[in-house]
């Protein structure tokens, strides 16, 4: 069965030629950080908002180096306290379909810590789908060889974040696997229920950036406990906080060491007054140390 690209034509272009050109243009503006990037944190808003930022993540995916891409994204539409896997064989994009690695999803399910998503749950969620066109574009010459492992991450306790980190760490250590963590950063404004503004000496948009960059610095430290404390203290509305935390626990349980770096940051708009709103997009990479 196929997961249809339900957000094409609204969140991003559904015309293959135009979409490919758009992605190519954005990728040409970005610069690769390192040949050894093993994981990225990339945004998942509509491409008119975050498409350019995502290029700074995906320029670091070298498809020739990998056989499968794990994608961890938050669940926006269904409340779940666990992680969900897809039963579908293929996920569609306008520029080429991506096959699911069923052997891997079955092995993950057999751990007893995952559930199966329904087709409608898969198709309603945008955080995973918004990563697919970029993967398909970057891997356009290897679409038949590359597979994906989409994982929908629910609202996890710290203990479960750690558990999933331990489960997934051996997969991260496998040199054939690349990990994508899907997350936007601060959602600021009354419509998001978040209007924290403590440093009145700077404009609101600058305060938001300070807040986000503090979070990104903690992610760079690789400490999931400190990241949890930061979220508890600031209540920053990072929608992919659980996938990010799982990724930090993965690196904690990895047999290798990783350098975590911030690559790019922007906001959908500059908040000047309290009635304004914005969403932030931060891009980070996890690079294996030699």
Curated annotation (Swiss-Prot):
InterPro entries (alphabetical): MEMO1_fam (IPR002737)
Domain of life, per lineage: Eukaryota
Pfam family, one: Memo
This protein's UniProt keywords: Coiled coil
Keyword Coiled coil on entry: yes
Stretches of the chain forming a coiled coil according to its record: 12-39
Glycosyltransferase found in the keyword field: no
Entry's family note: Belongs to the MEMO1 family.
Protein's recorded name: Protein MEMO1 homolog
Organism field: Dictyostelium discoideum (Social amoeba)
């Amino acid at each position: 069965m196929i997961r249809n690209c339900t957000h094409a034509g609204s969140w991003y272009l559904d015309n293959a030629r135009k979409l490919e050109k758009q992605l190519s243009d954005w990728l040409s503006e970005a610069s690769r950080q390192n040949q050894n990037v093993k994981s990225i944190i990339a945004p998942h808003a509509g491409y008119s908002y975050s498409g350019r930022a995502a290029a700074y993540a995906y320029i670091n995916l070298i498809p020739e180096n990998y056989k499968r891409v794990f994608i961890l994204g938050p669940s926006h539409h269904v409340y779940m306290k666990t992680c969900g896997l897809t039963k579908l064989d293929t996920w569609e994009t306008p520029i080429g379909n991506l096959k699911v690695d069923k052997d891997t999803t079955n092995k993950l399910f057999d751990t007893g810590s995952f559930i199966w998503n329904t087709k409608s749950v898969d198709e309603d969620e945008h955080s995973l789908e918004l990563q697919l066109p970029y993967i398909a574009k970057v891997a356009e010459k290897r679409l038949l060889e590359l597979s994906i492992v989409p994982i929908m991450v629910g609202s996890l306790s710290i203990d479960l974040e750690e558990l999933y980190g331990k489960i997934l760490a051996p997969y991260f250590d496998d040199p054939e696997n690349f990990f994508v963590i899907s997350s936007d950063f601060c959602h600021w404004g009354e419509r998001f229920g978040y209007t924290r503004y403590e440093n009145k000496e700077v404009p609101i948009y600058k305060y938001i950036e300070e807040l986000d960059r503090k979070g990104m610095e903690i992610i760079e430290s690789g400490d999931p406990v400190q990241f949890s404390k930061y979220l508890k203290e600031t209540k920053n509305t990072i929608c992919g906080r659980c996938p990010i935390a799982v990724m930090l626990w993965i690196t904690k349980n990895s047999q290798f060491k990783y350098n975590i770096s911030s690559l790019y940051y922007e906001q959908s708009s500059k908040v000047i007054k309290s009635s304004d709103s914005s969403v932030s997009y931060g891009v980070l990479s996890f690079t294996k140390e030699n």
